[in-house]
Amino acid sequence: MTISNRILLGVNIDHVATLRQARGTRYPDPVKAALDAEEAGADGITVHLREDRRHIQERDVLLLKDVLQTRMNFEMGVTEEMMAFAERIRPAHICLVPETRQELTTEGGLDVAGQEERIRAAVERLSKIGSEVSLFIDADERQIAASKRVGAPAIELHTGRYADAETPSEVAEELKRVADGVAFGLAQGLIVNAGHGLHYHNVEAVAAIKGINELNIGHALVAHALFVGFKSAVSEMKTLILAAARH
């Protein structure tokens, strides 16, 4: 991913699949959601194929690979199964994420510093198929520096702590943590993306941080789409982040 001169919006469609899997039906179709998102201005589509297959399925990923007009950001755990699948589909972008079976959603960043050899091997292997590999990490200098050392060209900073902050002082503290992480990542020569827990009422402050390349947003878009439709939900978010980034 070349660094854009404007902030990009990656739309995560996992929770369209969550709604489908709740009843084991064929609808709603995450592929349809992805195409609608592209029409509404999404710069890319993010999907997470989890080990437990709780939402996105292999078939979804294969279909998306064939029909997307933008690009796929394939989120995956660092497992042999996922590595082999990624080598099969060769997505434009791969984001390595931590994964545990009991979590409701990804609860924290990947501990790159604690497993550098393993992550370095994964980055090298996935880079050979032409994918740009990013690491989903906390906005922590130790993890950012480790990401640089293992050869990842990009990182995605976990904004969950900011999203969960309740008091004004906590929000300010966590926002500063993200902003500092962005600055440090850029100083390391990394492409810096961000995401997790962002919605229509908290995204503007993050989008205004200079240097962020892309925001990945999913749950809030799917929830808002229940009331306004998916295209409108994506379009509204795109308008918000572009306006915030210009100021």
Swiss-Prot record:
GO cellular component: cytosol
Xref: InterPro entries: Aldolase_TIM, PyrdxlP_synth_PdxJ, Pyridoxine-5'_phos_synth
Protein's UniProt name: Pyridoxine 5'-phosphate synthase
NCBIfam families, alphabetized: pdxJ (TIGR00559), PRK05265.1-1 (NF003623), PRK05265.1-3 (NF003625), PRK05265.1-5 (NF003627)
Site-annotated residues for Transition state stabilizer: 156
Single Gene Ontology MF annotation: pyridoxine 5'-phosphate synthase activity
EC class of the enzyme, as a word: transferase
Organism: Pseudomonas fluorescens (strain Pf0-1)
UniProt EC number: 2.6.99.2
Disulfide bonds: none
Family: Belongs to the PNP synthase family.
Residues binding 3-amino-2-oxopropyl phosphate: 12, 23, 197, 218-219
Subcellular locations according to the entry: Cytoplasm
GO biological process, one term: pyridoxine biosynthetic process
Record Pfam families: PdxJ
Active site: residue positions: 48, 75, 196
Pathway: Cofactor biosynthesis; pyridoxine 5'-phosphate biosynthesis; pyridoxine 5'-phosphate from D-erythrose 4-phosphate: step 5/5
Binding-site residues, 1-deoxy-D-xylulose 5-phosphate: 14-15, 50, 55, 105
Keywords: Cytoplasm, Pyridoxine biosynthesis, Transferase
Function: Catalyzes the complicated ring closure reaction between the two acyclic compounds 1-deoxy-D-xylulose-5-phosphate (DXP) and 3-amino-2-oxopropyl phosphate (1-amino-acetone-3-phosphate or AAP) to form pyridoxine 5'-phosphate (PNP) and inorganic phosphate.
Complex and partners: Homooctamer; tetramer of dimers.
Record field: catalytic activity: 3-amino-2-oxopropyl phosphate + 1-deoxy-D-xylulose 5-phosphate = pyridoxine 5'-phosphate + phosphate + 2 H2O + H(+)
